[in-house]
Amino acid sequence: MTNHKKEALLQNFNKKFADKMHMLKLNYDHLPLYQQAFSHSSFINDFNMDRLAHNERLEFLGDAVLELTVSRYLFDKYPELPEGNLTKMRATIVCEPSLVIFANKIQLNELILLGKGEEKTGGRTRPSLVSDAFEAFVGALYLDQGLDAVWQFSEEVIFPHVEDDELMGVVDFKTQFQELIHRLSKGNVTYRLIDEQGPAHHRLFTSEVLLEGEPVAKGQGRTKKESEQKAAEKAYNDMKKK
């Protein structure tokens, strides 16, 4: 392909990237760094660019930055959880399927620069390719704006969704609470749905957890399962404080 074609693709990227960063309320200084973050090896090969101009090195860096950022978040948010649970949570949050979920929430895949063949074969929606681009973007953001900017990005794109039903099972507070009650010989734990509100496509469920038939905590979520998890989390934390 010609350099003219490459420049046209990069100009299109520059505009879309500026719009995306504005939407995310993020600043940037070094545009070529982000061009590299979204450059798949197929794009580099099509235009005979430097063999290290693709995003794999930034992906490597972004992976480590994400692990650090998520580790700090979990450490602060769940002071009662032991190391094993925190490790399990972190692994689930930074795994490929989760990163694809986060990337898709902000349509990050539309920024990826692909070679002609990769584009034709559906590379833009390939999970491994999308998650790699997400990590590379985080790596570029870290180099360009520092860890504070990565934290700001994570507060908008990652942290609010850690307990979404899509990622549920990362921390199973129902099991945590059940095990705590068993250790304390406190009796039987049950759950009941006490309220549903909102239209079918955006329901809000409220559940409560009962100990020996007596309500001890309530929780809300977008699914019944999530509301039960929230109720169990509150009951678990309250019980640990006693």
UniProtKB/Swiss-Prot annotation:
The keyword Secreted does not apply. It is found in: Cytoplasm. Residues 223-242 have a biased composition (Basic and acidic residues). Residues 10-146 form the RNase III domain. The active site is at D63, E135. GO terms for biological process: mRNA processing; regulation of gene expression; rRNA processing; tRNA processing. InterPro entries: dsRBD_dom (IPR014720), RNase_III (IPR011907), RNase_III_dom (IPR000999), RNase_III_sf (IPR036389). SMART domains: DSRM, RIBOc. One of its GO terms (molecular function) is double-stranded RNA binding. Residues 172-241 form the DRBM domain. Belongs to the ribonuclease III family. Digests double-stranded RNA. Involved in the processing of primary rRNA transcript to yield the immediate precursors to the large and small rRNAs (23S and 16S). Processes some mRNAs, and tRNAs when they are encoded in the rRNA operon. Processes pre-crRNA and tracrRNA of type II CRISPR loci if present in the organism. Homodimer. This is Ribonuclease 3.
